[in-house]
């Protein structure tokens, strides 16, 4: 399965092609014409700050989360998965929001697609929180990412990781707990990155029955909000 999560818009040696910076800025401005005015629904009668997936609206992003700022938004697109019944394609929406607190809200849902790209059935779903914490393996380091997820398939997963660059992040499962009705899964490794065109791309590998990491999910999602 292809990824793209580790790529960027630079050429060989990290040098931008002539004019590519101007084109990237122009493309970003054009995209923002559609996405900048959108946000996620919110109840306006609650006494707490509303969740926002648009950095132009709502509470200011907590300073502790600045290294995760590019993730905030609503992302939609398609990807490829590998399951017990073989490879498949899926559609996906990821909502990354905040309320000014020291964490990001994360909600991802996907749906399987037919060979012609039509909706087939519900897919994977997860919800949780991103935050920065003291590195559990190095108390003097404060740039460890903690991602806590609850999966609709019946398990809870704790990831730790680090920023790889200003726009890419790598995480690995540290702990996993399964409910009595939950599916049996192994730990995972995830890589997220903002790639050329401003899209969010990621790859996930999971430990199989033989104890090795194997490709599980990959997708490239375009910004819909923010």
Curated annotation (Swiss-Prot):
- Give the organism, scientific name: Mycobacterium tuberculosis (strain ATCC 25618 / H37Rv)
Family to which the UniProt record says this protein belongs? Belongs to the nitrobindin family.
InterPro entries, A to Z? Calycin (IPR012674), Nb(III)_bact/plant (IPR022939), Nitrobindin (IPR045165), THAP4-like_heme-bd (IPR014878)
N-acetylserine carried by residues:
2
Q: Quote the entry's note on domains.
A: Forms a 10-stranded antiparallel beta-barrel structure able to accommodate a hydrophobic ligand in its interior. In fact, this fold hosts the heme group, which is located in a wide surface cleft.
What start and end residues bound the annotated signal peptide? none
Q: Which cofactors does this protein require? A: heme b
Pathway this chain belongs to: Nitrogen metabolism
- In Swiss-Prot or TrEMBL terms, this protein is called Peroxynitrite isomerase 2
């Amino acid at each position: 399965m292809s990824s793209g999560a580790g790529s960027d818009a630079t050429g060989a040696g990290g040098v931008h092609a002539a004019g590519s910076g101007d084109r990237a800025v122009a493309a970003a401005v054009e995209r923002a014409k559609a996405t900048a005015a959108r946000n996620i629904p919110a109840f306006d009668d609650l006494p707490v700050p509303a969740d926002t997936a648009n950095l132009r609206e709502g509470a200011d992003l907590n300073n502790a989360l600045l290294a995760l700022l590019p993730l905030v938004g609503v992302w939609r697109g398609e990807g490829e998965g590998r399951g017990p019944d073989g490879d498949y394609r899926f559609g996906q929406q990821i909502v990354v929001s905040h309320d000014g607190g020291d964490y990001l809200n994360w909600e991802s849902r996907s749906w399987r697609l037919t060979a012609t790209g039509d909706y087939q059935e519900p897919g994977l779903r997860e919800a949780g929180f991103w935050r920065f914490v003291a590195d559990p393996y190095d108390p003097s380091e404060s740039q460890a990412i903690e991602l806590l997820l609850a999966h609709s398939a019946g398990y809870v997963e704790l990831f730790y990781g680090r920023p790889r660059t200003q726009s890419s992040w790598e995480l690995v499962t540290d702990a996993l707990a399964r409910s009595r009705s939950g599916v049996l899964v192994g730990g995972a490794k995830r890589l997220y990155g903002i790639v050329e065109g401003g899209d969010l791309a990621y790859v996930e590998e999971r430990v199989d029955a033989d104890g090795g990491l194997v490709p599980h999910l990959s997708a490239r999602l375009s910004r819909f909000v923010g």
